[in-house]
């Protein structure tokens, strides 16, 4: 079972925002209490935070899917929903966050460094927050927006000052165990070290970290052995230490050929790093120390003395050591400390230069009055010989997600927001006509509707004045003139009905009773006498 993982794929999802509440205050002796729907809470975010106690990404290997809690919906009586708690994920120091295309999103260095991996959704506003002098009691609320979804690759690059590289069984693990309190696995067979080991070394007043990575062999850049998989852990090191086995009995191997093979494999890996990050110092240009190990063996000491001169002619500082007898370890530790101190001083100098360089402050952005067309972009596309107008922008897309399309009043409110933002004016300007299809948002999950300008549509959709709640509207009383017109209309309708019945009676369509005939004749006689 894996105990060390330095590269994982993580699927992070922020919590959804809670929906706003639609509520009207109900209280005795207050028939028009007004809206009191609360706002929904924001969804929780997924946050990566550097934890000094964390040393591996093993937890994400077992649980790659991480989702933050949702925000709670709003309630009546002005009760707002609780915000979803942020999901904080602990990662080791030196974790690099990349997207699926390999672009670096964040490089987390230092205790407490954070990166928001997936932001939570925004909570919807309740109808109390949407009330205005013109919209006193909204009958709708805004929905909460969904949280962000992101799939990233987490890659661990160990934070060490010195890196030990060499062939398998060269004594790298024995060296780090002899110089520090680290206790890596040590055995007499190749590839005993399968994961990087870190050890802290104290040399005088300098304290630094040494990293031991799995061994390299010729052809590692082509995938032989363990390949170059673990060399990412030496990218941050200030110096490299080549550990050469002088007691090996393998044919065709000697300290010089081993060193040349290591340099060749490092050059292949350095090219890959340069392609990803051109600003980093290549591995081939970093300081180096050559350690000739196992000189406690007589034949190994003779070989070390033989190749030492040529190595020094190449410009390498050479140290003859023995991890068994601890010979030469003190001199080696102080040489490492000198390289680390020099690298730290150079880093401090570069940091001071970055601070002293004047920073050009951009001109403050002043909010423009009126509409800003930069908040959205409209493009025309021809689909099946019909024009389609595609609207993209942070505000329009968020407003669509917040709209409950089952509520006509909410749809009217969305149309008002679009009109104030200037989308309708822009559609008119580029030649859109009523009835054309308009797509808001991305292709895969956008909203498509037939465009009808608000000047000709809106109130018809709501069945009443848009932006008001018909439940709280006072019934308007008809005027005296309207009552008179309604009375005359009813009298004319009755006269027309009586005339139609008389024509049917005379035509013999129906006959009247004796009592009805007597009443009719009496009425006619009375009308004649009055005339």
Curated annotation (Swiss-Prot):
One of its GO terms (biological process) is ribosome biogenesis. The keyword GTP-binding applies. GO terms for molecular function: GTP binding; GTPase activity; magnesium ion binding. It holds the Pfam family MMR_HSR1. Keywords: Cytoplasm, GTP-binding, Hydrolase, Magnesium, Metal-binding, Nucleotide-binding. Residues 160-341 form the OBG-type G domain. Its cofactor is Mg(2+). Residues 468-507, 514-531 have a biased composition (Basic and acidic residues). GO terms for cellular component: cytoplasm. InterPro entries: G_OBG, GTP-bd, GTP-bd_Obg/CgtA, GTP-bd_prot_GTP1/OBG_C_sf, GTP1-OBG_CS, GTP1_OBG_dom, GTP1_OBG_dom_sf, OBG_GTPase. Residues 346-365, 459-531 are annotated as: Disordered. Its EC number is 3.6.5.-. SUPFAM superfamilies: Obg GTP-binding protein C-terminal domain, Obg GTP-binding protein N-terminal domain, P-loop containing nucleoside triphosphate hydrolases. GTP binds at residues 166-173, 191-195, 212-215, 293-296, 322-324. It comes from the Bacteria. Mg(2+) binds at residues 173, 193. Residues 2-159 form the Obg domain. It is found in: Cytoplasm. NCBIfam families: Obg_CgtA (TIGR02729), Obg_CgtA_exten (TIGR03595), PRK12296.1 (NF008954), PRK12297.1 (NF008955), PRK12299.1 (NF008956). An essential GTPase which binds GTP, GDP and possibly (p)ppGpp with moderate affinity, with high nucleotide exchange rates and a fairly low GTP hydrolysis rate. Plays a role in control of the cell cycle, stress response, ribosome biogenesis and in those bacteria that undergo differentiation, in morphogenesis control. PANTHER family: DEVELOPMENTALLY REGULATED GTP-BINDING PROTEIN-RELATED, MITOCHONDRIAL RIBOSOME-ASSOCIATED GTPASE 2. This is GTPase Obg.
């Amino acid at each position: 079972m894996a105990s060390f993982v330095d590269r994982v794929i993580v699927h992070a999802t922020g919590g959804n925002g809670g929906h706003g509440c639609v509520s009207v205050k109900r209280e005795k002796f207050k028939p028009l209490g007004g809206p009191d729907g609360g706002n929904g809470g924001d969804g929780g975010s997924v946050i990566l935070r550097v934890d000094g106690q964390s040393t591996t990404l093993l937890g994400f290997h077992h649980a790659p899917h991480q989702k933050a809690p949702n925000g709670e919906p709003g309630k009546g009586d002005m009760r707002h929903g609780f915000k979803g708690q942020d999901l904080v994920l602990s990662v080791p120091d030196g974790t690099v966050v990349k997207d699926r295309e390999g672009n670096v999103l964040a490089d987390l260095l230092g205790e407490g460094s954070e990166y928001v991996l997936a932001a939570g959704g925004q909570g919807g506003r309740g109808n109390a927050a949407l009330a205005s002098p013109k919209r006193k009691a909204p009958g709708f609320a805004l929905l909460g927006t969904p949280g962000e979804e992101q799939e990233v690759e987490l890659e661990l690059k160990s934070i060490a000052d010195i890196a030990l590289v060499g062939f398998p069984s060269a004594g790298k693990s024995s060296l780090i165990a002899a110089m520090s309190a680290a206790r890596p696995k040590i055995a007499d067979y190749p590839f005993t070290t399968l994961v990087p080991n870190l050890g802290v070394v104290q040399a005088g007043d300098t304290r630094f970290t040494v990293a031991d990575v799995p061994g390299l062999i010729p052809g590692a850049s082509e995938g032989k052995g363990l390949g170059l998989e673990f060399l990412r852990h030496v990218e941050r090191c200030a110096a490299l230490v080549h550990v050469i086995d002088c007691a090996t009995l393998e044919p065709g191997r000697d300290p010089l050929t081993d060193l040349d093979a290591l340099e060749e494999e490092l050059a292949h890996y350095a090219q890959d790093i340069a392609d990803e990050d051109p600003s980093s110092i290549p591995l081939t240009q970093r300081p180096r120390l050559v350690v000739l190990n196992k000189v406690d063996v007589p034949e190994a000491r003779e070989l070390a003395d033989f190749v030492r001169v040529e190595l020094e002619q190449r410009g390498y500082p050479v140290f003859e050591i023995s991890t068994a007898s601890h010979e030469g370890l003190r001199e080696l530790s102080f040489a490492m400390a000198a390289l680390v101190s020099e690298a730290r001083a150079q880093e401090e100098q570069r940091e001071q230069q970055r601070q002293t360089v004047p920073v050009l402050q951009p001109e403050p952005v002043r909010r423009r009055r009126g509409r800003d067309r930069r908040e959205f972009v409209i493009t025309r596309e021809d689909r099946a010989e019909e024009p389609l107008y595609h609207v993209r922008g942070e505000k329009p897309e968020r407003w669509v997600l917040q709209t409950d399309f089952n509520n006509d009043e909410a749809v009217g409110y969305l149309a008002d927001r679009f009109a104030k933002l200037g989308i309708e004016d822009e559609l008119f300007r580029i030649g859109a006509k009523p009835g054309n299809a308009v797509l808001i948002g991305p292709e895969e999950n956008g909203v498509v509707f037939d465009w009808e300008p608000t000047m000709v549509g809106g109130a018809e959709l709501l069945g009443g004045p848009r932006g008001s709640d018909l439940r709280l509207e006072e019934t308007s009383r008809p005027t005296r003139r309207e009552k008179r017109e309604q009375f005359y209309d009813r009298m004319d309708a009755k006269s027309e009905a009586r005339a139609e019945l008389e024509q049917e009676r005379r035509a013999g369509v129906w006959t009247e009773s004796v009592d009805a005939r007597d009443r009719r004749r009496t009425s006619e006689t009375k009308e004649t006498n009055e005339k």
